[in-house]
């Protein structure tokens, strides 16, 4: 299959384009996703190509957007819905938890909610406290939801196509800092302009990436780093700069979790560091630490370390002090190696 060099934005648009063409039941909607093409231009050109009945705008009502999507899914459509920022999902919480996640269970399988809820998440664009949150832990503990976060254009397209085809409701979190290329997380360097970021080769047509399989992005033997989204690149840079032979695992799917890959890696290395951008207390990293303790306790050579955002709102002026950069991750890698 031919490939094209794409950003994550372009890869996501390509995924929706492929599925709109393949399946007449697929519809795309949300705030400003029609003619405007979305606040990040992920849906640019799709309404022109497929018409206003397939790609259309929604009122500024997250609860109404999700509730409508649940109804569409119950009656045969496959909605791909955008919440403009993950920070805005809170008004839709009841629809997500009580309706979207539980429809199949509550109807004894008579109805399903095969919808994909796309949400840009995380910091790195100076969005401040209301445009920078990483709320993944709130979704992973809701029974009935799948939660996905890609870290690169190839995975973004393949995971989004797989999500649209899935009969389960999927929370699809998109790290904004990666929209136009990878980022190494150094807050003590000028932020690389998006136009200069390297892109990735992405197949032009249809393909999928499994919704429940992690990827080892950097093989290693000394310590296992469990991470996802933007911090995948931070962990890779930290491993190189610290000189620690770290194995970096990109979870890709936060739930269901690829526990087999995690356990196999930690049993091999005997050490584990968990890295994510969200706040520390009750963050998804706490669940990862618990699972590693349960399944790998007798193989551990050192206590598990966590490197996360701080337990504060996301500060605009101090964004890079909040963000877990390579220096903090590198210090954790060295710490577990000293035990």
UniProtKB/Swiss-Prot annotation:
Its EC number is 1.2.4.4. Keywords: Oxidoreductase, Thiamine pyrophosphate. It comes from the Bacteria. The keyword Oxidoreductase applies. It holds the Pfam family Transket_pyr. One of its GO terms (biological process) is response to nutrient. It catalyses: N(6)-[(R)-lipoyl]-L-lysyl-[protein] + 3-methyl-2-oxobutanoate + H(+) = N(6)-[(R)-S(8)-2-methylpropanoyldihydrolipoyl]-L-lysyl-[protein] + CO2. CDD domains: TPP_PYR_E1-PDHc-beta_like. One of its GO terms (molecular function) is 3-methyl-2-oxobutanoate dehydrogenase (2-methylpropanoyl-transferring) activity. Its cofactor is thiamine diphosphate. Heterodimer of an alpha and a beta chain. The branched-chain alpha-keto dehydrogenase complex catalyzes the overall conversion of alpha-keto acids to acyl-CoA and CO(2). It contains multiple copies of three enzymatic components: branched-chain alpha-keto acid decarboxylase (E1), lipoamide acyltransferase (E2) and lipoamide dehydrogenase (E3). This is 2-oxoisovalerate dehydrogenase subunit beta. It comes from Pseudomonas putida (Arthrobacter siderocapsulatus). The lineage of its organism: Bacteria, Pseudomonadati, Pseudomonadota, Gammaproteobacteria, Pseudomonadales.
